[in-house]
Amino acid sequence: MAELACFCYPCDREGASVARYSRSAIKCMLSAKIDKSHSSQPYDTQVYGLAPPPVYKKRFNDGNNSRGMNFDTDMYDKVADLLVQILNGIKIGKDKAAEIMAVPISVRHLENLIYRIENKDDILSADPNLITKSVLIAMGLIKDCELTTTAEGGDIVFQNQGFTMWRLDYKSHVLMPITDPNFVEYKITLNHTNPIDDKIVKELVAELRWQYNKFAVITHGKGHYRVVRYSTVANHADRVYSTFKSIQKRNPSYKFNELDTRVIWTNWAAFVKSMLNGMKLDDSKRLLFTKMKPNESSFKGVTTERKLDEVSLLG
């Protein structure tokens, strides 16, 4: 994740409310000694124009911070250009742009959208309106859920009338690659917003139960499912809890999308319920380690029950 301010800044130019930073400006900012009292504002490099606020230094890989973005790349330029294009295209205005600069966005999600846009076989590449909608969803600026047509993409490994399951290949990414050679993760998006027939849901549950029984099906509350290794669920819980509390502070009316509990891993559904009821993180996470009965509404002949020794892999 990185704040929008790591890519662009509000401006008041003819036809533009936001402008992007250059790589040269970022390099200058990373090497400059800057008073802390000025760290929350874009830094004037005197030579290359404005650079991101120094408070976000750790978001960039300067050679000593491998967890930061690899900003000195063509991919950084593409993502920054895309964000500026979309925000200026909707005529966001300088004041509104200033309000959203601190909004965190998924760098990997945006890089995947670039790959979709560059793929001439993908419908996204030829539809400017769909591109705009996909980016605004990725930024959290509209309430629409990430559906299959607006998804970040990946390799499709399963699809039926209601759902599409994507294998996420973050290991080959440029900006923030995942270096764990054992990383495997999937995302399931809805194909439409209409009610989905039980038969279609059962097809998905059966696929997950028998083909992905070493994985937990969870949700981050954004209208899609995540299929992750049991050993990573605790880390996902930390991130989801932190993100939920952060969003709730900015927007008390925010609604966490719990999705279909027949698909979600029972323990994760319990974790989410406890989080939404105001329980502390540690208390909520204990439910991830507790043996639970499968959802009573699960489909006949298909179970999402997990063995206790599988749950104990949580770390």
Swiss-Prot record:
Note down the stretches annotated as region RNA-binding.
Answer: 204-240
Q: What is its EC number?
A: 3.6.4.-
Which spans of this chain does the record mark as coiled coil? none
**Which cofactors, if any, are listed as required?**
Mg(2+)
Q: Tell me one GO molecular function of this protein.
A: ATP binding
Q: Where found in the cell?
A: Host cytoplasm
Major localisation: host cell
Give the quaternary structure.
Answer: Homooctamer. Interacts with VP1; this interaction is weak. Interacts with NSP5; this interaction leads to up-regulation of NSP5 phosphorylation and formation of viral factories. Interacts with host DCP1A, DCP1B, DDX6, EDC4 and EIF2S1/eIF2-alpha; these interactions are probably part of the sequestration of some host SGs and PBs proteins in viral factories.
Q: What is this protein called?
A: Non-structural protein 2
Gene source species: Rotavirus A (strain RVA/Turkey/Ireland/Ty-1/1978/G7P[17])
Lineage in the entry?
A: Viruses, Riboviria, Orthornavirae, Duplornaviricota, Resentoviricetes
